[in-house]
């Protein structure tokens, strides 16, 4: 059920939960629709990822989903298509406090992202709070002085180069957590479409341990319940355990198959695939 707006609109409860080591269970949103987002908001997840990298989301569709989630006790996380300074500025002005930025391969990239998410003098974020939903259009009097501290920056490491630089990336001040992307990582390691390959699995486990050892929050997406629980046991603190598109597709196929004859069902088996997506 919808909840009253939190007393402190600037407090990033998701960031504070990660800092406290409290596991946060999430769901990926790829349907790019506020109605679906609101359904998922009431399901009981700690966070929902609005995906702008692989789903057909833009700034306006992201805004609509943020508005749909606002009345619920769930933390929105937004993944932009790329770590572009200008796009990040727009998302932050919409009220996004937690960003998951894909394809971060070097500590230099990570430092640039920290700069993009902070107001001067700590960063280079442009100031336009009178136009920003984030400040409630200047109705939050201390927004400009507190905004930097409440931003949660999560960077996504998903390549061989990223793994090589993982320790340096995790050490960047202002990076709150590092997310391992199994699908792209498997491709980079030479196992396209096979994130469960032993080489990939070993690389993921090693990466999660290194992130935790660096004192940063470790995250991952796995629709395999056994694997998701395994990653939590390894110390991952923000774990997405499903994708809305997959949930809908599987439920629709299962329902249709239950009314079809056996030969049709055998001729059209449930797609398995190797990707967590």
UniProtKB/Swiss-Prot annotation:
Catalytic function, reaction form: D-glyceraldehyde + 3-hydroxypyruvate = (3R,4S,5R)-3,4,5,6-tetrahydroxy-2-oxohexanoate; D-glyceraldehyde + 3-hydroxypyruvate = 2-dehydro-D-gluconate; D-glyceraldehyde + 3-hydroxypyruvate = 2-dehydro-D-galactonate; D-glyceraldehyde + pyruvate = 2-dehydro-3-deoxy-L-galactonate
**Which residues are tagged with the site Transition state stabilizer?**
79
Q: Name one GO biological process term.
A: phenylacetate catabolic process
- Organism superkingdom: Bacteria
Sorted keywords for this record are: Lyase, Metal-binding, Pyruvate
Residues the record marks as site: Increases basicity of active site His = 93
- SUPFAM superfamilies on file: Phosphoenolpyruvate/pyruvate domain
Among the Pfam families in the record, one is HpcH_HpaI
Its function, per the record, reads: Aldolase which can catalyze in vitro the aldolisation reaction between hydroxypyruvate (HPA) or pyruvate (PA) and D-glyceraldehyde (D-GA). The condensation of hydroxypyruvate and D-glyceraldehyde produces (3R,4S,5R)-3,4,5,6-tetrahydroxy-2-oxohexanoate as the major product, 2-dehydro-D-gluconate and 2-dehydro-D-galactonate. The condensation of pyruvate and D-glyceraldehyde produces 2-dehydro-3-deoxy-L-galactonate as the major product.
Q: Give the protein family.
A: Belongs to the HpcH/HpaI aldolase family.
What's the protein here called?
Answer: Hydroxypyruvate/pyruvate aldolase
């Amino acid at each position: 059920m919808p909840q009253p707006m939190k007393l402190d609109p600037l407090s990033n409860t998701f960031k504070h939960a990660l800092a406290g080591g409290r596991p946060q269970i999430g769901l990926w949103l790829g349907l790019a629709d506020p109605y679906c987002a609101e359904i998922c908001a009431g399901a009981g997840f700690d966070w929902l990822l609005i995906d702008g990298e692989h789903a057909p989301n833009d700034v306006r569709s992201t805004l609509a989903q943020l508005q749909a989630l606002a009345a619920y006790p769930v933390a929105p996380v937004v993944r932009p298509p790329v770590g572009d300074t200008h796009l990040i500025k727009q998302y932050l002005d919409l009220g996004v406090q937690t960003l998951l930025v894909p394809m971060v391969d070097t500590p230099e990239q990570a430092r640039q992202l920290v700069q993009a998410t902070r107001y001067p003098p700590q960063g280079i974020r442009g100031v336009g709070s009178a136009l920003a939903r984030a400040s409630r259009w200047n109705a939050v009097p201390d927004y400009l002085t507190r905004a930097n501290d409440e931003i949660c920056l999560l960077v996504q490491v998903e390549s061989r180069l990223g793994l090589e630089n993982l320790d340096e990336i995790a050490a960047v001040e202002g990076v709150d957590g590092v997310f391992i992307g199994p699908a792209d990582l498997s491709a980079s390691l030479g196992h396209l479409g096979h994130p469960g390959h032993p080489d990939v699995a070993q690389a993921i486990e090693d990466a999660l341990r290194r992130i935790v050892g660096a004192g940063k929050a470790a995250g991952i997406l796995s629709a395999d319940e056994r694997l998701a629980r395994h990653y939590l046991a390894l110390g991952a603190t923000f774990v997405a355990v499903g994708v809305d598109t997959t949930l809908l597709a599987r439920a629709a196929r299962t329902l249709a198959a239950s009314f079809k004859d056996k030969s049709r069902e055998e001729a059209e088996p449930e797609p398995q695939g190797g990707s967590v997506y």
